[in-house]
């Protein structure tokens, strides 16, 4: 299976997302695509986390609302099919409401990792929905279903191989398989993030399949 990886700049705008979709479907071959969050999104999520740490709920909510408006605008640029447009906007509303929910709890590094993970969850869901709108047989394989690191923060290769092989044996008949670049589960089954360069591990792992 062909493997392609795109960073945040490559999916940094609706136009660039469209370009990525053209590129990954051009060969017609089954392709595993690893995506990062849209450029700027991770920085915004870190800023939101910093506000939550300081218990500045208004500050956090302001950034969340700005980010939500931006993504809603992106949805209008990408999704001309009204049904798909409504579905993706409903998904976006749910994600941003989820971000706002952190104002009710004690905020720790555990919650921060969950907040930061939302960037890749947003980008991969949007790209997958756009591909489907264009008639491409595409599916999203959440990285949290297979990607795991051990207590040394290194990819747990045995676990990853086992899980991804099982998933791909079930998810057949697709041209494009989308997943996230950095989010994962840690040795304690908590949401975590790979270290810098971690998505390279992910790409290498799929290339070896």
Annotate each predicted stretch with a short phrase.
Residues 1-208:
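Nucleotide/pyrophosphate-binding catalytic subdomain
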């Amino acid at each position: 299976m062909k493997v392609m990886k795109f960073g945040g700049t490559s999916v940094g705008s609706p136009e660039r997302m469209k370009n990525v979709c053209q590129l990954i479907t051009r060969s017609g071959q089954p392709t595993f695509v690893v995506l990062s969050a849209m450029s700027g999104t991770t920085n915004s999520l870190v800023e939101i986390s910093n506000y939550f740490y300081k218990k500045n709920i208004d500050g956090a909510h302001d950034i969340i609302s700005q980010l939500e408006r931006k993504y809603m605008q992106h949805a209008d640029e990408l999704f001309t099919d009204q049904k798909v447009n409504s579905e993706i906007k409903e998904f976006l509303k749910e994600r941003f409401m989820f971000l706002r929910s952190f104002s009710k709890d004690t905020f720790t590094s555990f919650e921060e990792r969950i907040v930061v993970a939302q960037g890749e969850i947003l980008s991969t869901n949007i790209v997958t929905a756009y591909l489907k709108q264009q008639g491409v047989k595409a599916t999203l394989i959440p990285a949290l279903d297979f990607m795991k690191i051990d207590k040394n923060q290194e990819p747990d290769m045995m676990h990853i191989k086992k899980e991804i092989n099982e998933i791909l044996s079930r998810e057949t008949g697709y041209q494009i398989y989308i997943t996230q670049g950095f989010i994962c589960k840690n040795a304690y089954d908590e949401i975590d993030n790979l270290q810098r360069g971690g998505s390279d591990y992910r790409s290498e792992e799929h290339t070896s399949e």
